[in-house]
Amino acid sequence: DNRKIKANYRGFYNVYNILAAYAAARTAGLELKNYNKVLADYNPQNGRMEHFRIKNTDVLLNLAKNPAGFNQNISAVQEDDKPKDIIVLINDRDQDGIDISWLWDVDFDRFQDMNAASITVSGIRCQDMRLRLKYVDIPSILEGDVEKAIRDRVEDGVGNLYVLVNYTALFSTRNILKKLEGER
């Protein structure tokens, strides 16, 4: 119907989601005149490019549970041309699956093609994540304490921070970010 749809979400996968929702609503015969307003008012939650403002740092939290999702996250981070810090948190609890071999299927070499001031690895499997990055010649900072990793980047980073987490790291990391956002 030649409708122009505007959305302020990063990540190409969001285009699919937005268009799928539009197509479903249109097929169901719903009124769509306010679709752009609904998109503008929508605030992603629970680690879906969720935004936090901590001191003078913009922080985006995003969930990555598998190679396809992680590669989409990397694409979303690449869309941002500004200097950035990146934290990658990987756990291996039951809900994540204890086999983390999937990390070798992620195109982490693409981190070289972005304006990353630093990459920090954290979480239960931070050593494995650091090794994975080493194999594609990407230096990383190892910080097992998640809150310290975030605080360090907020204090000494470039003011633009991406935090990429797998499932069991999401909720605890989100709580840390909410706590830090509330500190003055």
Question: What is the meaning of each model-derived region?
Answer:
Residues 17, 21, 119, 163:
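Residue-level signal for inorganic ion chemistry
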